[in-house]
Amino acid sequence: SGGKKIKVDKPLGLGGGLTVDIDA
């Protein structure tokens, strides 16, 4: 991949973690 990983804790207060792996 070689992209960047974005770690977001409780996005928009959904009560959960979100890990987005962008292949840029």
From Swiss-Prot:
Signal peptide: none annotated. It is found in: Plastid, Chloroplast thylakoid membrane. One of its GO terms (biological process) is photosynthesis. It comes from the Eukaryota. GO terms for cellular component: chloroplast thylakoid membrane; photosystem II. Keywords: Chloroplast, Membrane, Photosynthesis, Photosystem II, Plastid, Thylakoid. Belongs to the psbR family. Associated with the oxygen-evolving complex of photosystem II. This is Photosystem II 10 kDa polypeptide. The gene is PSBR.
